[in-house]
Every structure is written in C-alpha cells, then in structure tokens.
C-alpha cells in the first residue's frame, strides 16, 4: 500500500472487520473522505501534532485563503466529481468530506475544494467528535481516513480503509528502534 501511495496512486488498507455497506441506496455509490493527509496534504496536521490545537487554529486562520496542497486521494475525488458532472441514469455518485476540523479551520478546506473546482455533496466538520455515528447517517459504501482511531470508530458502522499517509503514519524505516 505504501508503495502505491509513494507512486501517486490512492491506496488504503481495508479494515476486515468493517461493517457491510448499507443496501438502502442501491442506485448510488457513496464515498466519504477525511481531509488532512487524505484529500489534502498533512501540512495542517503537522502543525496540530507539533504545537497543539491553538497553533493549528491560528495557522489555518492565517492561511485561510491559501489552498492546501493535494493529498493522495485528491485524484480519486476528482475522478468521482467528473463522473458526477457527466451524470448517468444508471447510478448516482455522492461524495462527502468528513473531517475533525471545525470553525475557523473549515474555511481553508472549503476554499481548497473551490480552488480545485470540486464539489462534495456533504461536508461534515466535526470538531474532533468521533466520526462513526455521522458516517452511519451518510451511509457511504466506503470511508477513507489516515488515523486509526477514526477508522476504528467508522468501521463499527461503515466499510472503512486506513490510508497510511502523512505525519500520523511514518514510514517503517523512520520509526525509532526500541533496541537503542
């Protein structure tokens, strides 16, 4: 999976114990994405992990008008958006951004999507709340996130996959050895 991500191909490890996709929407494909380190780069997540919530909020407020760089799943979201634009009577595509961000950091995420000319059908800015219950309501066929805690919450309700991207997922060679 990491080799695919390094090559610019969206990839995730499917959680085998994830809930099955809902059959309530048979003529729709619903895909939900986390923001930082999935759709977007992990720039903001690095600030949060190094300096805390206040520094993260200040950083995002100061850079609200500057779009985030693309993360590994931007190409998939862009492809889904193109399918939505072309439209097909057989199946409808719906997308969602489900992120731990909240005000005022939500503005940069929204502006980034606008800069990319990509629309999502749902945007959930959860302010750190567990994502599972919210995803249960959207009923995605799949959810992608870079943080295992969010995946574990989501997997109780929807099919979910872990994206080994960003600061929360250091490459195995960069993890300090405990033998030292």
Predicted segments, located by residue:
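Short hydrophobic/aromatic-enriched beta-strand-loop microsegments
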Residues: 10-16, 120-124, 144, 159-166
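Short acidic loop-to-helix transition motifs that present clustered carboxylates
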Residues: 19, 126-132
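Alpha-helical substrate-recognition element adjacent to the catalytic core
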Residues: 24-27, 34-125
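Internal alpha/beta domain cores that form substrate/cofactor-binding pockets in large enzymes
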Residues: 95-97, 101, 123-124, 151-180
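Acidic, divalent-metal-coordinating active-site segment for phosphoryl/phosphodiester hydrolysis
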Residues: 1-7, 130-135, 146-158
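Acidic di-acidic motifs
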Residues: 34, 145-146
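Non-catalytic pre-domain segments flanking phosphatase-related domains
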Residues: 1-33, 139, 166-180
């Amino acid at each position: 999976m990491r080799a695919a991500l390094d090559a610019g191909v969206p990839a995730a490890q499917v959680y085998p114990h994830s809930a099955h996709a809902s059959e309530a929407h048979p003529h729709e494909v619903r895909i939900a994405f986390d923001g930082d380190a999935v759709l977007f780069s992990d720039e903001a997540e690095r600030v949060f992990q190094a300096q805390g919530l206040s520094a993260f909020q200040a950083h995002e407020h100061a850079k609200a008008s500057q779009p985030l760089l693309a993360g590994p799943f931007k190409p998939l979201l862009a492809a889904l958006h193109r399918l939505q634009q072309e439209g097909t009577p057989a199946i409808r595509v719906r997308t969602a951004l489900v992120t731990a961000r909240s005000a005022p950091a939500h503005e940069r995420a929204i502006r980034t999507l606008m800069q990319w000319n990509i629309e999502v059908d749902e945007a959930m800015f959860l302010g750190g709340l567990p994502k599972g219950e919210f995803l249960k309501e959207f009923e995605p066929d799949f959810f992608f996130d870079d943080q295992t805690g969010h995946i574990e919450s989501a997997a109780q309700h929807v099919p979910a996959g872990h994206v080994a991207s960003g600061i929360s997922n250091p490459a195995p060679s960069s993890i300090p050895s405990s033998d030292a």
